[in-house]
UniProtKB/Swiss-Prot annotation:
The keyword Iron-sulfur does not apply. This is C-type lectin domain family 7 member A. N-glycosylated. Phosphorylated on tyrosine residues in response to beta-glucan binding. Disruption phenotype: Mice were born at the normal Mendelian ratio without obvious anatomical defects but are susceptible to infection with C.albicans. They show impaired myeloid cell activation by fungal particles. Deficient leukocytes display impaired responses to fungi, characterized by reduced inflammatory cell recruitment after fungal infection, resulting in substantially increased fungal burdens and enhanced fungal dissemination.
Length: 244
């Protein structure tokens, strides 16, 4: 029998030197242990860059627009600014007539299509005249003066159709009376219109409201559908008329 010696590479003391060489050990690729990773997309950095570029462009455009608007406003000289402000105030400033006059809605404004073009604002057109129902209290003389300042006169009723129109307006304000352009110089004297023409009781009658001892009821107002004489210094509303 032959013995095969398996003792190799003995050192000086007789110990066997073990060879742990890793030449025969084959390591698996790292990718096989953890699994292969998908390569990253080459378009991702490009998309991110384009997004940042667009954002920068929008910001720059907004800043330039704001600077341009500021420069345009600051470039206007003081005189132009003052003129602009003054024109704006004039456009929004209410007129004297709009402050003094108040006009109630009426049937005539509905039947005639509102305030007609030939008449001024707050005036109502009927026939060949414009009428203003003034709701600022005044005496007969003060009302006459007020209508004259507007280029008109106190109401003069020429016929029954005109009286029906006026009655349709005043009937909706039965608690109020309106001065008209009819007066007389003395008690029991004849009535005259403001233009000096005589009054003829064809369309209406003037009812007497004065006691026997009073001599001051020398002016006329219309109250609802009735016409009365009254003291001229009494404060009341009025009706102005202007022919077209």
């Amino acid at each position: 029998m032959k013995y095969h010696s398996h003792i190799e590479n003995l050192d000086e003391d007789g110990y066997t030197q073990l060879d742990f060489s890793t030449q025969d050990i084959h390591k698996r690729p790292r990718g096989s242990e953890k699994g292969s990773q998908a390569p990253s997309s080459p378009w991702r950095p490009i998309a991110v860059g384009l997004g940042i570029l667009c954002f920068v462009v929008v910001v720059v455009a907004a800043v330039l627009g704001a600077l341009g608007e500021y420069g345009h406003n600051s470039g206007r000289n003081p005189e132009e600014k003052d003129n602009f402000l003054s024109r704006n105030k004039e456009n929004h400033k209410p007129t004297e007539s709009s402050l003094d006059e108040k006009v109630a809605p009426s049937k005539a404004s509905q039947t005639t299509g509102g305030f007609s073009q030939p008449c001024l604002p707050n005036w109502i057109m009927h026939g060949k005249s414009c009428y203003l129902f003034s709701f600022s209290g005044n005496s007969w003389y003060g009302s006459k003066r007020h209508c004259s300042q507007l280029g008109a006169h106190l109401l003069k009723i020429d016929n029954s159709k005109e009286f029906e129109f006026i009655e349709s307006q005043t009937s909706s304000h039965r608690i109020n009376a309106f001065w008209i352009g009819l007066s007389r110089n003395q008690s029991e004297g004849p009535w005259f219109w403001e233009d000096g023409s005589a009054f003829f009781p064809n369309s209406f009658q003037v009812r007497n409201t004065a006691p026997q001892e009073s001599l001051l009821h020398n002016c006329v107002w219309i109250h609802g559908s009735e016409v009365y004489n009254q003291i001229c210094n009494t404060s009341s509303y009025s009706i102005c008329e202007k022919e077209l």
